[in-house]
Amino acid sequence: MTESYLALESSIDPLTFLTLMTRITQYILPLLFGLLLLSCSKDKQSQQTTQDEQQTPRVATPFEADSAYNFVAKQVAFGPRIPGSSGHTACLAWMKERLTQYGATVVEQSFEATAHDGTKLPLTNLIASYNPSASQRILLMAHWDTRPWADKDPNAANHTEPILGADDGGSGVGVLLEVARLLGSVAPPQTIGVDIVLFDGEDYGSYSNEESWCLGSTHWSKNPHVADYQAMGGILLDMVGGRDASFYWEYFSKSYAPQLLTKVWSKAVELGYGSYFHQADGGGLTDDHVPVIRNLGIPCIDIVNYDPRSEEGFAPYWHTLQDNMSNISAETLGAVGHTVMAVLKELDAH
């Protein structure tokens, strides 16, 4: 999924930027998180060329990429996960069952939202918490709904057909379910808490209205599952399963969570995933991390397959009927999942 949201390209409205900056500066938490990251990081790595990054030897991973792949395939087997559909209902029940089985404290946040076209949408955010009593917390996010229309499909006859959303919707959830499995078994957090939030209603937007996207994250960030919720930082996974995916520094991520962004990308390169994680600027995207930054002041980053060098930015199958399992790579899922687990391990050790 992740979003088909309208890609804002790199042009950001100055007023929007100023509003966001004003809100964010009201919070001191991002500064504290920056100090934490600096204290547990080694010497800064200098930026490497793509060739150097590709030659970095890969480190053995505890993250089971095949398991994450199977989690994606299971979601796709439910069919399109459009709010109110049978596939949506069945997938929600399955995700809740998995997360409960993996030892999380699970909360369902059900609500009704009005879409840009006036449609009343029954939505549910799913929150899974590990070590809920810990005061220092990390937020991991993805969206689990799929786009109702394949409106970027090269065949106009398909524009009203729903997509399967293997990558855009399924991939981020697949990685986080595998993270949850590990947190509930071999890698339980000791000193920090981890909250996995799966957002609904991200992909029901209109390209001409950026506020019409990210309905689930907007609702949760205004009505968090815990009163006065805060986290040291947040990591959003969106479209993280494509073959030969390219993850660049997303604009809002770099603006509001530069320490976390550097931490994650440097760790990815250290682990041998520099061919995926490019240490260079990408575009600005309206994605689920933006409402969380705006409404809660939590510094968040977006790991999203968006290549500013390409014409569309997103993968060719984005919002088309081709967003299916044929475009999902276990290797890409493993690169992202291994990186996230390694960052969690470092933060938990300090």
Feature roles, as predicted:
Residues 120, 233, 242-350:
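Active-site-adjacent substrate-binding region
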